[in-house]
Amino acid sequence: NTTMIQLGTAFCSLVNGGKLYQPRVVSKITDQNGNTIQDISPTLLRETVSKTTSDTLKQYMYSTVTSGTGNTAKVDGYSMGGKTGTAQKVPRDGVNYLVSFIGFAPVDDPQFCG
C-alpha cells in the first residue's frame, strides 16, 4: 500500500529536478507579531531521476493537460502538467473504473503538486 503523502512526495520529486525532499507541513515558526522564530529548511533525501529526465517528464505531463487525457483538469491562467490513471474495480465488468489525476504548476518552476 502507498499513502497519499508517499505518492505526492514521489511525484513532486519527478517534477522538482529529481530531488526528493522529506515531506513537511511547516516552513517556519513565527511569533504573534509575524516575526520568524525558526526557519525549517527542506531536507534533501536523494535524487530519484536526473534533471534532464525531470525536464522531459514535465513536458510530457504538460502535453497530457493541454491536449491529452488530462485536459479536463486544465485551469485557465496556469501552466500545468499532470498524470492520469485508470483502474478497473472488482468485479471487472468493463463498466466500473477508478480514475485519478495528480498534477503540478507552474510547469517552468513547480510550486504546487497535488
What residue spans do the PLM features occupy?
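Active-site beta-strand/loop architecture of penicillin-binding DD-peptidases
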Residues: N1-L44, T52, M61-G114
